[in-house]
Amino acid sequence: MGKGVGRDKYEPAAVSEHGDKKKAKKERDMDELKKEVSMDDHKLSLDELHRKYGTDLSRGLTTARAAEILARDGPNALTPPPTTPEWVKFCRQLFGGFSMLLWIGAILCFLAYGIQAATEEEPQNDNLYLGVVLSAVVIITGCFSYYQEAKSSKIMESFKNMVPQQALVIRNGEKMSINAEEVVIGDLVEVKGGDRIPADLRIISANGCKVDNSSLTGESEPQTRSPDFTNENPLETRNIAFFSTNCVKGTARGIVVYTGDRTVMGRIATLASGLEGGQTPIAAEIEHFIHIITGVAVFLGVSFFILSLILEYTWLEAVIFLIGIIVANVPEGLLATVTVCLTLTAKRMARKNCLVKNLEAVETLGSTSTICSDKTGTLTQNRMTVAHMWFDNQIHEADTTENQSGVSFDKSSATWLALSRIAGLCNRAVFQANQENLPILKRAVAGDASESALLKCIELCCGSVKEMRDRYAKIVEIPFNSTNKYQLSIHKNPNTSEPRHLLVMKGAPERILDRCSSILLHGKEQPLDEELKDALQNAYLELGGLGERVLGFRHLFLPDEQFPEGFQFDTDDVNFPVENLCFVGFISMIGPPRAAVPDAVGKCRGAGIKVIMVTGDHPITAKAIAKGAGIISEGNETVEDIAARLNIPVRQVNPRDAKACVVHGSDLKDMTSEQLDGILKYHTEIVFARTSPQQKLIIVEGCQRQGAIVAVTGDGVNDSPALKKADIGVAMGIVGSDASKQAADMILLDDNFASIVTGVEEGRLIFDNLKKSIAYTLTSNIPEITPFLIFIIANIPLPLGTVTILCIDLGTDMVPAISLAYEQAESDIMKRQPRNPKTDKLVNERLISMAYGQIGMIQALGGFFTYFVILAENGFLPTHLLGLRVDWDDRWINDVEDSYGQQWTYEQRKIVEFTCHTAFFVSIVVVQWADLVICKTRRNSVFQQGMKNKILIFGLFEETALAAFLSYCPGMGVALRMYPLKPTWWFCAFPYSLLIFVYDEVRKLIIRRRPGGWVEKETYY
């Protein structure tokens, strides 16, 4: 985004003749955006700035010149990305993936009906009904999915909210408020506390100006802005303020150096909207499954089409058969089952504080192998808290737990009382009103993060700070500023045994120590000699090394003879001592890890998931937090740790000896992708510190190059490109910016890393349960297809009709299939490695072999047994049925003889045939009972798993009740051509149901007894 990037770069490219030119340009643009922010305006002197932009530093641009630049560069606004129209999204739901298979089925049905209508006098309406039902299924499920996902999308909408409406510019020497879109490069702009920065500014003058850069760089503390060039990196230097960040206090004046899409924020917006999200793993799985099913259907269809022509059927009949076989292979209910299963899991996750925006993301989280987590607010509590104190020449640990259950220290020490008094008095933070009944740590505070931490600590240890402040009334105060780096106040001292005025001071330790001549030890003041100074310095370095923010505290009792009652203290022309004070102690603060985080990180490690911390913080702080959160585990060393232990230079340590690794953003900037790949490959515990948004994206891409499925957490605008690029983006619900929530697939409502682990568990469970659900649904395909195939080959009366197939797929099988989504995990699913998307498929050859080749075949036998029993009871023995089809289906023949010589009219024959259809249907329901029970587990015995799934038990009753209703309800003979059955016919399939159960229990027993053996390799899906 430096000077080299001309304005033409951002104009829409002319439509090229070749699509690949466009693609190459898009890739080039994306590479350009991934580069670090490069600008040199922060290095220029005011004179050079004036020459570069032609701006008068006191009068600004002329109105005419501003108009010219506006015409050249266009408005100061973010270009909205091309959005997908709603109708296109709806069509994707209607015609994407699985739906396409059903549409093809429906079209083939209408085609078959058309052929029948054209060639027969009284065609049957089965195919017409089937076509209508299939279309209805797709439309209803499509609407449902569209409704579920319509709640998301539109990344740029949130960026629009970030564009400030008005800006104060100086043109022709006059201040004027203009629409922010009219701000141009070279404009002289003024901002004050509460304003949003209207463009990227080079600050030329400032007064106590602080900006909140958290949405851009992830730094939680407000950053000082001044005209000084303090850092080579434009994101770190103090003299650049960025578009759409907030000015929180003070005033500043600056020259606009970038506008619109060319600003740092504009680049991030372009980056986020230009990224391709990629296909979710579950979408890829469903696509793979459709290929398998379509392959099977077409292979069977074409084989039997050729076979029927060989068997001398007419080509019209052969086409009808072809269509029938393809449609019979389509599991009509599966699309709805998968959608409902994912929705149920999404609802279950919402109850556990994970809000899923994109249904397919539910499963993606389960296959995650790497989590790149932000630090602030996700791994840590989003607040500072006191971690350690140093007084009486030793370090004391404070209690940082959320429920105050940790260690304590001696609170009766006179030095601690003096230290707590300074921390309470030299502090502007106050509790907000009406919170008396809330626990102290949960109360809201008006004040900055460090002072809030001190206030809560003193309130917990010493009682009411407000009462302390009332007793020690404040007389004057010098607030903290970046030059002095200390805060000072003078108070009335209520203790009559001591001088009347107490001066208290806190600030950066290095500034504090210079001003002290004595130290308070065990309540007694002693001179500060070199030995004590070294002890202080070491304590400061030790606390700083823990990644904590250290503040020093000292006081001074002002002598009464110099400062009598009513003395007028002057803070402008200081008339009181600020040197030779008495040092009391240090207090250090940290953003502590959330209580559940170390446990959650441990769970991830057990589940084979790598947790990488990516933060904008200083490496020392980042490393300390990573150790506290368990990301760098006990005993694992970085290269620096090994060098320190062996007392050798860092370069002599082999990087591969270190399991842990802390990478600084500036090092990452100079790395090739091969070097980054090496770090990701050879180190198990990684922390990236001081990273920029572009680098976060590069880290995600690096992990994906390793074949990892990456989840990324983030809350700032700076995180949205990485959230979009990741396989699953997880945004923070409480502190997250709108932009990050738009880019993410999932939102953590409680901002807690532990909720992600819950999500991973749910994701793994739904993958297992979807497998079971699909295995259950596919099994009944075989008893549905085989009647049709035998009907063609053996020329027997049709054993099972199209309408009855629909009653199974969209009726009796639906609730049981969905009930498997409620099944509990078989074993500890968080103890196994993440699944490999290349090898561990949702539907694999073993699942097809089990469903079609084994269990499905037993089910088909059960159905045919019932079919032959009924026809035999009616006089048609099995041998007599061969070749009977042509006469049987001819409506003009009314004297077909059975095995005993009885004659049957067409009407009578059809009633027996439809009774057989009903009985075959009931047999499938009976054998599906056993199938449902065996699908509860893939490895364990059903007796180990138990029958605790109430929905599944309801499913068993529901499918039986529905089958009975369809069979016995008056009028069904006309509506669905289903007829009442004798009670004994229900029992024909029972032995087959029992056989399925026993067969599968034995198979699972062998798998458990001989892990890795032949049975597991061939049948464990």
UniProtKB/Swiss-Prot annotation:
Q: Which residues carry this modification: N6-succinyllysine?
A: 659
Q: Record keywords: Glycoprotein included?
A: no
Query: Which keywords appear in this protein's UniProt record, sorted alphabetically?
Result: Acetylation, ATP-binding, Cell membrane, Cell projection, Ion transport, Magnesium, Membrane, Metal-binding, Nucleotide-binding, Phosphoprotein, Potassium, Potassium transport, Sodium, Sodium transport, Sodium/potassium transport, Translocase, Transmembrane, Transmembrane helix, Transport
Residue ranges annotated as propeptide are: 1-5
Q: Which InterPro entries match?
A: ATPase_P-typ_cation-transptr_C (IPR006068), ATPase_P-typ_cation-transptr_N (IPR004014), ATPase_P-typ_cyto_dom_N (IPR023299), ATPase_P-typ_P_site (IPR018303), ATPase_P-typ_TM_dom_sf (IPR023298), ATPase_P-typ_transduc_dom_A_sf (IPR008250), Cation_transp_ATPase_P-type (IPR050510), HAD-like_sf (IPR036412)
Q: Which Pfam families match?
A: Cation_ATPase (PF13246), Cation_ATPase_C (PF00689), Cation_ATPase_N (PF00690), E1-E2_ATPase (PF00122)
Residues recorded with modification Phosphotyrosine: 10, 258, 540
Q: Where in the cell is it found?
A: Cell membrane; Basolateral cell membrane; Cell membrane, Sarcolemma; Cell projection, Axon
Q: Where are the transmembrane segments?
A: 86-106, 130-150, 287-306, 319-336, 771-790, 801-821, 842-864, 917-936, 950-968, 984-1004
Residue numbers on the Cytoplasmic membrane side: 4-85, 151-286, 337-770, 822-841, 937-949, 1005-1021
Positions contributing to Mg(2+) binding: 715, 719
Which reactions appear under catalytic activity for this entry? Answer: K(+)(out) + Na(+)(in) + ATP + H2O = K(+)(in) + Na(+)(out) + ADP + phosphate + H(+)
UniProt-annotated stretches for the region Disordered: 1-36, 214-233
Name of the protein in question: Sodium/potassium-transporting ATPase subunit alpha-1
Give the organism, scientific name. Canis lupus familiaris
